[in-house]
Amino acid sequence: MFKKVENKANFPKIEEKILKFWNDNKIFEKSIKQREGCEEFTFYDGPPFATGLPHFGHFVPNTIKDIIPRYQTMQGKYVKRNFGWDTHGLPVEYEVEKKLGISGKYEIENYGIENFNKECRKIVLRYTEEWKNIILRLGRWVDFEKGYKTMDISFMESVWWVFKNLYEKGLIYESYYVLPYSPKLATPLSNFEVNLGEYKEVNDPSLTIKFKIKDKNEYLLVWTTTPWTLPSNLGIAVGQEIEYSKIFDKTKEEILILGSKKLNSYYDDENSYTIIEKFKGSKLEGIEYEPIFNYFLEQKDKGAFKVHTADYVTTDDGTGIVHIAPFGEEDYRILKKHTNVDIIDPLDAECKFTNQVKDFKGLFVKDADKKIIENLKLRNFLFKRENYLHRYPFCYRTNCPIIYRPISSWFVNVEKIKTKLLEVNEKINWMPAHLKKGRFGKWLENAKDWAISRNRFWGNPIPIWICSKTGKKICIGSKKELENLSGQKIEDLHKDQIDKITWPSKDGGKFIRTSEVLDCWFESGAMPYASNHYPFTNEINFKNIFPADFIAEGLDQTRGWFYTLTILGTALFENTAFKNVIVNGLVLSSDGRKMSKSFKNYTDPMQVINTFGADALRLYLIMSPVVKADDLKYSDNGVRDVLKNIIIPIWNAYSFFTTYAIIDKFKPPKNLSLAKNNNLDKWIISELESLKKILNTEIDKYNLTKSIESLLEFIDKLNNWYIRRSRRRFWKSENDKDKNDAYETLYYAIKTLMILLAPFIPFITEEIYQNLKTDEDKQSIHLNDYPKANENFINKTIEEKINLARKITSMARSLRSLHNIKIRMPISTIYIVTKNQNEQNMLMEMQEIILDEINAKEMKIKANEEELITYKAKANFKELGKKLGKDMKAVSTEISKLKNEDIIKIINGTSYEIKVANAKHYLSLNDIILEREEKENLKVINEESITIGIDSLITKELYLEGLTREFVRQIQNLRKEKNFDVSDRINLYIENNETLKEMLNKFEKYIKTETLALNIILNKSKLEKKINLADDIFTLIGIEKC
């Protein structure tokens, strides 16, 4: 026997009850244990940082990461789900710096690296309990107890093994290179870390500087937007094919050289200068000039202070001449190619000038701009000063401007394996698919060598020891290897401990570790190996869990985790690290901005869950464009709408079934037969079996959008067609076979639908299942197998028939709404136009249903529209414009004059001739735009190949019937307001008026049947509610139980 179900459910409370049920009965653990020994489905969980609380952006991938493993478990596979934590790196260090009130490398070293790392270890798992509570409350099943942490010694050791493998393959090298650098973090960043940050519009000073050509009284006008790089100037670049002009400036009385195209930008008056000569940039190549600062004069003998040609120089901005300093990637490349200059980097770890540039010592580079400009102006080198608005990258962790500078770093040689990376990408199933060739594929095509070292403290140390005497390098791949070489016991692999480990070399020197730590992205990319402590343990099983069958994260990870996984998987095994990936977009606030606590532009996620329930939030996110890697403007109202339009209708269907099943004491049979006689039963069973087929196909393809759409379509069919059209079968008093078939069918449909929905909305499905399950059923809905389609009960013919009837009904309802004809007001006739003979036959079979649904008395089927409308035509300028030219206007006029019969001929395929002047033109249907004019009293609508019309003339008899239907509806509402049971018989009290008399004379039996009224009584004292039957017709009613 089923328990009674309340019409109004408190879904958050239900979810908390279900969480307790899962925990008390260890349902998650049982779901995994029952699949032990089955085919494994491998899932990698990308590790988040636990230094902040989860937000809506985390909820999307976490919902996806719950849906797929639940589904695959129900498909009979063994799916381990262990959570992971990213515990190293810049985010953690930055939090500790804020906590301690210190900043930068020097202050950390003064505080003590060991003390600093202890603080990092304390803070790194600050919010793990909050994460655990929120993720579990979202309904995600994941094992936090067996989760991995990147700071675990076992994890760190496997990362060393990965590093050594790459080192031995020649894929690791150390070099100076111009890299993006965070001054506040005092470390270089990788290119993809730069892309994780924000590019802001900034106003930088734009300078034009005079550089004097050696031994001549002539000046090169050189342009720059980075004044702070000028003290390190080592060269000048021009475009080889750009034309330059040597001019005499009459005002300054100086000879100047600049791009010819830029003369108008620098001189308003052509008479203020004289052109001496014009020449290509190639003529300037090799010319020496006098440096504007004397800090690095010793570099002159190594090729500094000369003009070079470069492809990147243009005349789009500035003068067409730019200065070269080793702070730009292209600049650095040209200096390496054409000179032997030393690597110049007069900046300390925080990007302040060192003593090498004594005039500006101690100044942060951006702050030094003003002083440098003053210096140049004072010494008459400044020709022009302006401001330049451009986009500039800012550090994704500290929000400070990124500085590009030459710095020693360790690299993965990505260029060397680029071809293989592209091959590996072809093996990956991307969802959405466009990312394969698009965002991710393009990123791989342009991939640069990956700077993996960080000049920081809390991270996995680069396992390379270097001989202090010879420079010989030894790369360590395990803890044991280091113990054997050093003769010391190793307890921890972090920098503060491992840097103490040294040993003598045979050459009389000492092996000392290189000071850097690894980029934390290297660790997350090594997660498939390190989380399993491969190859030190689990070596046999590893082949079964690599590559992953599935991963999921946000779009930003195409340049983050997806990228590093792919690089390391390719470098180690020439294989992808994952076979399938679902990529979600960004979750923004409702105003389209980034969600921010300071902006206060979003609701606390737990408040949303506690208001609407986790199921509603999950469904809202999965239904949205965010699952297709598009952005979502999050709205609480969107979650509310999902609750109202999807979750509650599911509950209502369940409530409807249990209400009547309890009344009739329905008990589901042990062997429920799907062979039914009623067409509605056959149809909903067929639709359900078809749905199973779609879901098994689409979820296997990781197409959650199509899966959800199919589920929602079925929910609509179940509620708004099957149940609505079957109500009378449940209402009737006799328990015949048809009624029992209706119970069995609805029971089967709801229970099966819950199992199909279970991976998506795990709470409400469990709640409903617990009331519907029999003694033979599994303890939890999530312990079931995912339903497979029974092809024997898929009946496409009956699906087509009823779906056609539903389409006609939908069109008719739209037409009524458009012309303000209420659905309870009967109409005399519906006209349906289709040329398709099969559709005509199906419509005849469905006539009774269609008439009932649209509240019409008669249905007429036509093959042509002409009986409903007359045609008018306008010229289709898009089509005709291509072929008519100057005759277009005249032909357009003639088209507007076409008669109805002429247009019908064109519709039927006849080519229609129009004469304009001496030319003949022939019109086809594509050349005209049809306009339909309805005939008198008809309202017409067209959708694809079907046109329908309704007779809008409402006779007195029809009007009275419409009022009666509205009268019944108002009585039903009053029953609900008074919490009457659906089976309660009533006395109906009415007042004495002419309208009610007419209604009762004609429709008394109908009113009694629909409202379960045994008696209709005139009694003023019992009247309790005033109701509105039409615009100006009111009456009073009252009801009481018999």
Curated annotation (Swiss-Prot):
Entry's localization field: Cytoplasm
Residues the entry annotates as binding ATP: K597
Motif 'HIGH' region per UniProt: ranges: 48-58
Motif 'KMSKS' region location, chain numbering: 594-598
Annotated InterPro entries: aa-tRNA-synth_Ia (IPR002300), Anticodon_Ile_ABEc (IPR033709), Ile-tRNA-ligase (IPR002301), Ile-tRNA-ligase_type2 (IPR023586), M/V/L/I-tRNA-synth_anticd-bd (IPR013155), Rossmann-like_a/b/a_fold (IPR014729), tRNAsynth_Ia_anticodon-bd (IPR009080), Val/Leu/Ile-tRNA-synth_edit (IPR009008)
GO terms, biological process: isoleucyl-tRNA aminoacylation
A cellular component annotation (GO) from this entry: cytoplasm
Required cofactor names: Zn(2+)
EC annotation from Swiss-Prot or TrEMBL: 6.1.1.5
Catalytic activity: tRNA(Ile) + L-isoleucine + ATP = L-isoleucyl-tRNA(Ile) + AMP + diphosphate
Coiled-coil stretches: none
GO molecular function: aminoacyl-tRNA deacylase activity; ATP binding; isoleucine-tRNA ligase activity; tRNA binding; zinc ion binding
Keyword line: Aminoacyl-tRNA synthetase, ATP-binding, Cytoplasm, Ligase, Metal-binding, Nucleotide-binding, Protein biosynthesis, Zinc
Family: Belongs to the class-I aminoacyl-tRNA synthetase family. IleS type 2 subfamily.
Notes concerning its domains: IleRS has two distinct active sites: one for aminoacylation and one for editing. The misactivated valine is translocated from the active site to the editing site, which sterically excludes the correctly activated isoleucine. The single editing site contains two valyl binding pockets, one specific for each substrate (Val-AMP or Val-tRNA(Ile)).
Subunit structure: Monomer.
Function recorded in the entry: Catalyzes the attachment of isoleucine to tRNA(Ile). As IleRS can inadvertently accommodate and process structurally similar amino acids such as valine, to avoid such errors it has two additional distinct tRNA(Ile)-dependent editing activities. One activity is designated as 'pretransfer' editing and involves the hydrolysis of activated Val-AMP. The other activity is designated 'posttransfer' editing and involves deacylation of mischarged Val-tRNA(Ile).
NCBIfam families for this protein: ileS
Protein name: Isoleucine--tRNA ligase
Species, as recorded: Borreliella burgdorferi (strain ATCC 35210 / DSM 4680 / CIP 102532 / B31) (Borrelia burgdorferi)
